[in-house]
A protein has these predicted regions:
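N-terminal intrinsically disordered, cationic/polar leader segments
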Residues: 1-35, 39-43, 47-54, 58-61, ...
Length: 129
């Protein structure tokens, strides 16, 4: 497959995804970028680490600003996202793998929980974000 085909496939996946699937994609993207940043830090490629930590920070920001505030649980999610974001910023400032891994642990937990919510929700129901 060439890059144009891959890009078209990814674009189509995003355009046809439900809000719940988009949230899952954001979690997966944050995990991917954290893993790439860890590789960058380990290989002393600070530019790679910075760029990918910034992408992960942007995803966490997007998850925070799109929280549905009509559900009381939004405040709990916001606190977790704030913690993750601060860890990513610290990791970017210090280029510290342990800080990225700490953030990654929480992102994975959030993603895994979200996958369970998606499975438990009846088909066609509106899932909270």
């Amino acid at each position: 497959m060439n890059q144009d085909t891959i890009n078209a496939y990814q674009r189509n996946a995003i355009l046809t995804a439900s809000p719940a699937e988009l949230t899952l994609m954001l979690y997966d993207g944050a995990i991917k970028f954290c893993n790439i940043a860890i590789i960058g830090i380990e290989k002393k490629d600070m530019e790679k680490a910075h760029v990918n930590l910034k992408k992960a920070q942007d995803i966490i920001t997007e998850l925070r600003v799109t929280l549905d505030r009509k559900y009381p649980v939004w405040e709990d999610f916001d606190r977790v996202y704030d913690y993750i974001y601060r860890r990513l910023v610290d990791a970017n400032m210090h280029k510290d793998v342990s800080e990225v891994e700490d953030a990654l642990k929480y992102i994975r937990e959030m993603r895994d929980t979200w996958k369970e919510v998606m499975k438990a929700a009846p088909a066609g129901s509106k899932q909270p974000k």
